Amino acid sequence: MELKVWVDGVQRIVCGVTEVTTCQEVVIALAQAIGRTGRYTLIEKWRDTERHLAPHENPIVSLNKWGQYASDVQLILRRTGPSLSERPTSDSVARIPERTLYRQSLPPLAKLRPQADKSIRRREPKRKSLTFTGGAKGLTDIFGKGKETEFRQKVLSNCRATAEELKRLIRLQTGKLQAIEKQLESSEAEIRFWEQKYSCSLEEEIVRLEQRIKRNDVEIEEEEFWENELQIEQENEKQLQDQLEEIRQKVTDCEGRLKDYLAQIHTMESGLQAEKLHREVQEAQVNEEEVKGKIEKVKGEMDLQGQQSLRLENGIRAVERSLGQATKRLQDKEQELEQLTKELRQVNLQQFIQQTGTKVTVLPAEPTEIEASQADIETEAPFQSGSLKRPGSSRQLPSNLRILQNPVSSGFNPEGIYV
């Protein structure tokens, strides 16, 4: 894999990084690329947050922990100070790589080391800066060619070197180069093997990562959209809160005015009640005078009615006395009528006996005739307008009595006399 690291504002790419690659190895590769010595620290930055990586930490593992935000994380190589001994050495004139070369691979030892071999990782305390002394080293120094270096130093220091020593040095270098070529061939074969083995998985991983990047972009867009919406809603909420405060202030003012109005209303109601009571007192006085006048008038009318009732009582007593006298006279007349009726019947009977010379049987008169005659007598004395009308001295006899007075005989005798 490739790891992007920012060095002095320039982005550099470190190739061949795996999950077991440590920060120390990445820093060594970058220090060799820029050709500078000193104390270096690898920093993991996300937005405004920075974290110093320890030398034994794995940058790939640390980036994977960020998940969908891994693309926003930056790795920065920062020089924190000079080396322990800034001395010019024979290697200080080593070739400094050009600034245009931005790709630097890890040392071959880091590639050839087995993934399972973690015993050689240094156990250093976290957040410890890395210190490198000396200039940039070559491949022979990386492979630990101490003998060749010492031999070359002897050759350079000894100006009287012989041709045999030079040939010996050439043969030694040729052997080393052949060994390196063989090692490179084996490494290339291994690389081809792993490329063939993981080409499909790498393509799938690339596709998956591209899809993930797209999803991350969509999520970022959605997040930006919702952040904008949140800001809009917050502004609206702030405006609504301001409006609410204004409304509350207005409500408070209205409540104060309402209290003043209620006090005025209570005062006016008290005045109206007092005025109403005054009017009611005046009206009660006027009504009392009117009632007194009406009472006097009613008393006068009651006196008149009392006098009239006395007169009526006296009249009623006189009428009752007259009625008693008339009733007594009527009873006397009825008794006289009964006596006359009996005498008349006897006279008629004697006349009938004398005319016919026969013996007859006298039947008693029917009671209905006597009751009818009494009813006729009672109806002749009505009362009109509360005054008694006394009957006159002359009184007509019933029609049946007039018939009996005539001595004429008839075929039908109403008195019930049969031969």
From Swiss-Prot:
Keyword Phosphoprotein: yes
PROSITE patterns: RA
Entry keyword annotation includes Phosphoprotein: yes
Stretches for region Disordered: 372-399
Modification Phosphoserine occurs at: 105, 129, 387
BP term (GO), one: signal transduction
Keywords assigned: Phosphoprotein
Biased composition regions of type Polar residues, renumbered to the chain: 382-399
Residues recorded with modification Phosphothreonine: 131
Domain Ras-associating positions: 1-82
Annotated protein name in UniProt: Ras association domain-containing protein 8
Name of the encoding gene: Rassf8
